[in-house]
From Swiss-Prot:
This is Aliphatic sulfonates import ATP-binding protein SsuB. Its main location: membrane. Belongs to the ABC transporter superfamily. Aliphatic sulfonates importer (TC 3.A.1.17.2) family. Residues 251-264 have a biased composition (Basic and acidic residues). The complex is composed of two ATP-binding proteins (SsuB), two transmembrane proteins (SsuC) and a solute-binding protein (SsuA). The gene is ssuB. It is found in: Cell inner membrane. The lineage of its organism: Bacteria, Pseudomonadati, Pseudomonadota, Betaproteobacteria, Burkholderiales.
Length: 278
């Protein structure tokens, strides 16, 4: 296996953030953020609650508007939602009144329904196509959410703590599934996670956000597939975790908070958009 993803020839989109800032009221959550992501790279974003991780992801998704700076996707200025971008959240957000196949096919023309079944097969749930969401486990629901995103063949996949509510064994299974599908499809991926081990397991680069700025950009030069029991893996995980913990926790704030990341929310700012897996 190669040490990192081969970005040349991948169908993922390049992403560039220039002087990106975001304010909620008087609080600046992101400030002058600079980031370049090559096509097909897998980027993990870590940091303490409230540091700006999920806000950055929502800006890239087009669910929030930047206070300053710009986002360029595939050399085009981002001005809103994109058909080439999909986002997954910790909550699978399946429609309980629709069967699994219909959740995956949501937004597809009728003549592409067969594609939904094919993607369900890729995530190991073809035999549950006609079940209701309530009959699935948490891990299975997230597999459906992943299938619903991938059926649209995104060039940029955003993952906002999608595995945070799953048990340890299910998380490991999902790591393997996400990595396999990423390697097969070649999309660019941005993962927000509190789990440094998860970041090292999946990413080409681990980005630490601290006080609204990128404080660390660590290349993960470990061969794939990665073993969490490997000494080099453990050493890199410890180094990044030590750096995350080096910064004392921020004092509590009096404000509305974002449910995913503890980031400030304010009246009139939409909490979600329509492109979460549609």
């Amino acid at each position: 296996m190669t040490t990192n993803s081969v970005t040349s020839g991948r169908r993922g989109e390049p992403l560039v953030l220039r002087d990106l800032s975001k304010r909620f009221g008087a609080r600046e959550v992101l400030r002058n953020t600079q980031l370049r992501v090559e096509p097909g790279q897998f980027i993990a974003i870590v940091g303490r609650s409230g540091c700006g991780k999920s806000t950055l992801l929502r800006l890239v998704a087009g669910l929030e508007t930047a206070s300053a700076g710009s986002i360029t996707v595939n050399d085009k200025l981002l001005t809103g939602l994109s058909d080439d971008t999909r986002i997954m959240f910790q909550d699978a957000r399946l429609l309980p009144w629709k069967r699994i196949i219909d959740n995956v096919a949501l937004g597809l023309p009728k003549d592409r329904r067969a594609e939904a079944l094919k993607v369900l097969d890729q995530v190991g749930l073809a035999d549950r196509a006609n079940d209701w969401p309530a009959r699935l486990s948490g891990g299975q629901r997230q597999r459906v959410s992943l299938a619903r995103a991938l059926v649209h063949k995104p060039r940029l996949l955003l993952l906002d703590e999608p595995l945070g509510a799953l048990d340890a064994l299910t998380r490991i299974e999902m790591h393997r599934l996400i990595e396999d599908l990423w390697r097969a499809s070649g999309f660019t991926a941005l993962l927000v996670t509190h789990d440094v081990q998860e970041a090292v397991a999946l990413a080409d680069r681990v980005i630490l956000i601290e006080d609204g700025r990128i404080a660390l950009d660590e290349t993960v030069s470990l061969a794939r597939p990665r073993s969490q029991g490997d000494a080099a893996f453990a050493a890199l995980e410890k180094r990044i975790l030590d750096r995350v913990l080096q910064k004392p926790a921020a004092p509590e704030r009096e404000s509305f908070t974002h449910p995913n990341d503890g980031e400030p929310r304010w009246p009139g700012v939409p909490a979600h958009g329509v492109r979460w897996a549609v």
